[in-house]
Amino acid sequence: MRYKITIEYNGSNFIGWQRQKHLSNSIQEILEEAIFKFSRESVTTYVAGRTDAGVHALGQVAHFDLTADFDAYVVRNAINYHLIPHSISVLNVEKTDDEFHARFSAKKRHYLYKIINRYSPLTIDYNRAWLVRNPLDVEKMMRAVEYIKGNHDFSSFRARHCQSKSPVKTMDDLKIIHSDQCIDIYFSAISFLHNQVRIIVGTLVECGKNSFPPEYTKDILEAKDRSYAGMTAPPYGLYFVKVDY
């Protein structure tokens, strides 16, 4: 029986989603151990988006197979019991057919990056948003966003060790919602390059600091060179929001 699970986690204390050979405390490892404790079956979980260390999730989706046929609510409650005290929560469980794949069946992925623009240190949002102390011109950031939407070669916005075969991606939607000191940047696409969202955010922040005009964003894209773009924004402001199937 295949189970589709929707999970939420605070990524602050984890090394990321994926199991790593010589490191422990990945979300995948802890989740699979929790599944084993209630089912007595060793499983491999497959996920919609492999988040890096420090990145959070509001609606991550994964799937796994068990020989036993449990009610969905039993699976949810049992996994959550064995996840205590980790900051991971199973929000929903659905039984699905064997054709469903958390990664390959995805039609669109949605991310959020949270910035707090003020001078004072963060307390409530510590490790859950990027504190940017320099005043940001959000209007300029919004204008820069328009150059990034659509289909482009995003070589300037990919990590140097990115393993994706092609740097060409389509940014279906990219918008900024600004309220007082909070700047929320929403991204939607079928898939993303490694660190693409965080490098775009770092570049938008540089634009907001008046390091360059919004129009220069087009030049950054056309350069197809990582050195032209801004810094890679820290992981703790990034959230995997949801995935469409």
UniProtKB/Swiss-Prot annotation:
The keyword Lipoprotein does not apply. It catalyses: uridine(38/39/40) in tRNA = pseudouridine(38/39/40) in tRNA. The active site is at D52 (nucleophile). It holds the Pfam family PseudoU_synth_1. Substrate binds at Y111. It is an enzyme of class 5 (isomerase). InterPro entries: PsdUridine_synth_cat_dom_sf, PsdUridine_synth_TruA, PsdUridine_synth_TruA_a/b_dom, PsdUridine_synth_TruA_C, TruA/RsuA/RluB/E/F_N. CDD domains: PseudoU_synth_EcTruA. Keywords: Isomerase, tRNA processing. GO terms for biological process: tRNA pseudouridine synthesis. Gene3D superfamilies: Pseudouridine synthase I, catalytic domain, C-terminal subdomain, Pseudouridine synthase I, catalytic domain, N-terminal subdomain. Its EC number is 5.4.99.12. GO terms for molecular function: RNA binding; tRNA pseudouridine(38-40) synthase activity. Formation of pseudouridine at positions 38, 39 and 40 in the anticodon stem and loop of transfer RNAs. HAMAP family: TruA (MF_00171). PANTHER family: PSEUDOURIDYLATE SYNTHASE (PTHR11142), TRNA PSEUDOURIDINE SYNTHASE-LIKE 1 (PTHR11142:SF0). Belongs to the tRNA pseudouridine synthase TruA family. Homodimer. This is tRNA pseudouridine synthase A. It comes from Ehrlichia canis (strain Jake). The lineage of its organism: Bacteria, Pseudomonadati, Pseudomonadota, Alphaproteobacteria, Rickettsiales. The gene is truA.
